């Protein structure tokens, strides 16, 4: 289990309160699909994903990105119990979707990049460290069913 300090929790929740989940979620998933094109195989029902502008403008990518980032809201509300919070999603992604758990780590790292671009100077090294810790813990929780 990962322990978050009061300072880390404050850094995460403060930034999360300013987050546009719809915009950042679509951008994060879109960036994942562009930068790591092999992840596109999990989204073959999303239509045209053949080039970056098609991916970034795809309404299904944006909608699913919002859904993914909304689940990070659950992580923020349950930072002390991530394994239980993501148990069902871990099972779904492992047993039904067969997603490589490495993709969770990649998405987390992409989210950190999105946060840095959206929040600039406000995204200090301390804030980044807190968020990196969270996205890593979420990736581990999502990959739990694989072990």
UniProtKB/Swiss-Prot annotation:
Domain Globin: 3-147
Tissue: Red blood cells.
SUPFAM superfamilies for this protein: Globin-like (SSF46458)
GO MF annotation list: haptoglobin binding; heme binding; hemoglobin alpha binding; metal ion binding; organic acid binding; oxygen binding; oxygen carrier activity; peroxidase activity
Primary role: The epsilon chain is a beta-type chain of early mammalian embryonic hemoglobin.
Signal peptide: none
Any GO BP: hydrogen peroxide catabolic process
PANTHER family, A to Z: HEMOGLOBIN FAMILY MEMBER, HEMOGLOBIN SUBUNIT EPSILON
Binding site for heme b: 64, 93
Keywords: Heme, Iron, Metal-binding, Oxygen transport, Phosphoprotein, Transport
InterPro entries: Globin, Globin-like_sf, Globin/Proto, Hemoglobin_b, Hemoglobin_oxygen_transport
Protein name: Hemoglobin subunit epsilon
Modification Phosphoserine occurs at: 14
GO cellular component: blood microparticle; haptoglobin-hemoglobin complex; hemoglobin complex
Subunit composition and interactions: Heterotetramer of two alpha chains and two epsilon chains in early embryonic hemoglobin Gower-2; two zeta chains and two epsilon chains in early embryonic hemoglobin Gower-1.
Organism from which the protein derives: Saguinus midas
Family according to the record: Belongs to the globin family.
Pfam families assigned to the protein according to its UniProt record, in alphabetical order: Globin (PF00042)
